[in-house]
Amino acid sequence: MKRIQAIVFDMDGVLIDSEELHAHAKRIAFAHAGIALSDVDLRSYVGRSDAVMIDEIGARHGLTDGQRSTVLNEKARIYEQEEHGIKIVPGAIEFVRWAAQHYRLALATSATPRNRTATLNRLGIANLFEATADLGDVSEPKPSPEIYLTVTARLALQPSQCLVVEDALTGVLSAKRAGCCVSALIRTFAADELLGAGADFIFEDFQSLKRSAEIEAYCN
């Protein structure tokens, strides 16, 4: 029996090219609160939940709880208004459909339950995932391992039996801390950063990942 029994996907940046819209919505929401976000601010929180980012940056700038809540709601409103324009990561859906023929599939995302459901339905692949975990399922978001421990438990598999597909440093850290084998798509972060965070292997596009023999080799 092959060691890898399931593939667990991140969503933002892996299945959908949403990071630019997330950044746009965050900039506007924070600007309305009098805070100008830098590129460093935005990059530092790629893969982390909006709530964590808004709490930490809001605290540094002295925002009250009410003001932080306003920023969070404004960011969500802008994202939801413009999400129809989000593009799919090239090759992602084809890879998911291929993987579903060879492995069990799951999803572990820092997105809200609403965004997770809306995205999978829009992509037409919700039925391919046996298990999902999102921000509403955990008390500690990525880079805590909780989300990957949650979704692998829902699959009734050990983390070591699962290959994770991530693109962000926080996601790689989360999956490695859970004990998963981790592949990382080179998009927002450079190869050396992803490997430095603990990725077992990296890939530039989904076509290069579409070889089960290589997956087994990298994860053993």
Range-by-range predicted roles:
Residues 1-5, 97, 112-220:
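Asp-based, Mg2+/Mn2+-dependent phosphohydrolase catalytic module
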Residues 3, 81-107, 111-113, 117:
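Short, acidic loop-to-helix structural element flanking the phosphoryl-transfer center
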Residues 29-30, 49-64, 119, 151-152:
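Helix-loop "lid/cap" segments that line or gate small-molecule binding pockets
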Residues 36, 104-105, 181, 200:
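Residue-level detector of anion-binding/catalytic polar loops
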Residues 48, 101-102, 197-198:
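Structured helix-beta-strand junction loops
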Residues 58-94:
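Metal-dependent phosphoesterase signature
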